[in-house]
From Swiss-Prot:
This is Large ribosomal subunit protein uL14. The gene is rplN. Keywords: Ribonucleoprotein, Ribosomal protein, RNA-binding, rRNA-binding. GO terms for molecular function: large ribosomal subunit rRNA binding; structural constituent of ribosome. GO terms for biological process: translation. Binds to 23S rRNA. Forms part of two intersubunit bridges in the 70S ribosome. Part of the 50S ribosomal subunit. Forms a cluster with proteins L3 and L19. In the 70S ribosome, L14 and L19 interact and together make contacts with the 16S rRNA in bridges B5 and B8. It comes from the Bacteria. GO terms for cellular component: cytosolic large ribosomal subunit. PANTHER family: 50S/60S RIBOSOMAL PROTEIN L14/L23, LARGE RIBOSOMAL SUBUNIT PROTEIN UL14M. Pfam families: Ribosomal_L14 (PF00238). Belongs to the universal ribosomal protein uL14 family.
Amino acid sequence: MIQTESRLEVADNTGAREVLCIKVLGGSKRRYASVGDIIKVTVKDAAPRGRVKKGDIYNAVVVRTAKGVRRADGSLVKFDGNAAVLLNNKLEPIGTRIFGPVTRELRTERFMKIVSLAPEVL
């Protein structure tokens, strides 16, 4: 579960290393985001020659959470940490590579590009 002020690692090659959630999108009273949800983030740590700079604000989709995702068959998919992929204003991924596994819950029309770039889909 991701909420405002949560820090996430970045699972793409945009140059950002860590981001801070500043808003969970989807209604004024929405508090938590899970895998597949879109959040507004600011870059807190970035590589020197990356595509993004510290302080930039982007949309991002949550791809991994430590809380986990409950499946219909009762199984629970958890990860060691929280991670997100940065998106542009058209909700397309900014990076060209995805690092680490992503969950099957991202297999919607909006995020098929992320699923196809990911090295492993759980």
